[in-house]
């Protein structure tokens, strides 16, 4: 996707060297927006192979309101493993287990998973069970789906994952923290605000995930898809990802694939992994990079 490569090029050319929480170091650029027309194809990077399996399972995990990684690791999704493992390594119960041994325990031992696999009140918790100051719990995803159906012209079609009172309890505060739907001419668009964006590892997942969420919501609300608008605060390339980014910039983007959603779902909560079929995806080979924790 040219839009993604333009972001990469801009950050390399105009970004600033900046220290970060992980100690890795970044080239950072503040304030950027990209628009993807979902009528033109599914925005999954072709300049490297992206693991759609993980994207779909993670999105369904968010939608179910889950915060424990057990169901992810049972489906061979590894993207959240580092954070609970890092926390476990600092506990009194750590017995020099490797990451692989830790993940096997999470997968097969429900009590261990309950104790060490939870990420705190992260995305799914806030989407489905946002706790108000009055003690009332709000299912934001349910409410926004109902509002799209009942009042599509509303300017309040918002889901917010940023809960200041619980930030310290989260393994990682939400990076993609707020999204808003917009209906015009029977088409559903989505705007995401992302406070922090790891351009090499995170952004390709974020684009595809929210594009897919928009398609799913449009389907159950009997709408066509419009645009996915991606607004980023701190857009950064980690210093240990620069060569990987340059490799992508040397590759010519290919035609976007198509995403087919099978089934007759009536609610955003009805989707299953098997409902999704990606067609005509011809990416370049995958490029590896280490996640900064």
Q: What do these predicted ranges mean?
A:
Residues 1-293:
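Terminal, non-catalytic protein-protein interaction segments that mediate quaternary/complex assembly
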């Amino acid at each position: 996707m040219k839009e993604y490569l333009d972001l990469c090029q801009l950050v390399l050319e105009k970004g600033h060297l900046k220290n970060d929480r992980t100690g890795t170091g970044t080239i950072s650029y503040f304030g950027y927006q990209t628009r993807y027309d979902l009528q033109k194809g599914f925005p999954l990077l072709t300049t490297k192979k992206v693991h759609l399996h993980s994207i779909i399972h993670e999105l369904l995990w968010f939608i179910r309101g889950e915060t424990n990684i057990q169901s992810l690791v049972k489906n061979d999704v590894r993207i959240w493993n580092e954070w609970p493992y890092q926390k476990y390594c600092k506990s009194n119960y750590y017995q020099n287990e490797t990451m692989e041994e830790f993940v096997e325990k999470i997968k097969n031992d429900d009590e261990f998973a309950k104790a060490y696999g939870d990420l705190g009140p992260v995305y799914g918790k806030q989407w489905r069970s946002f706790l108000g100051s009055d003690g009332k719990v709000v299912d934001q995803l349910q409410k926004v789906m109902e509002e799209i159906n009942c009042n599509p012209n509303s300017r309040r079609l918002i889901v917010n994952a940023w809960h200041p009172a619980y930030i310290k309890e989260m393994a990682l505060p939400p990076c993609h923290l707020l999204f808003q739907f917009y209906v015009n001419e029977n088409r559903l668009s989505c705007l995401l605000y992302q406070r922090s964006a790891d351009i090499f590892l995170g952004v390709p997942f974020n684009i595809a995930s929210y594009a897919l969420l928009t398609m799913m919501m449009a389907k159950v609300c009997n709408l066509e898809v419009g645009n996915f608008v991606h607004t980023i605060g701190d857009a950064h390339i980690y210093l240990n990802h620069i060569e990987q980014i340059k490799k992508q910039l040397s590759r010519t983007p290919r035609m976007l694939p198509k995403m087919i959603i099978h089934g007759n779902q009536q609610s955003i909560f009805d989707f299953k992994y098997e409902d999704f079929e990606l067609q005509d995806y011809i990416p370049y080979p995958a490029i590896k990079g280490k996640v900064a924790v």
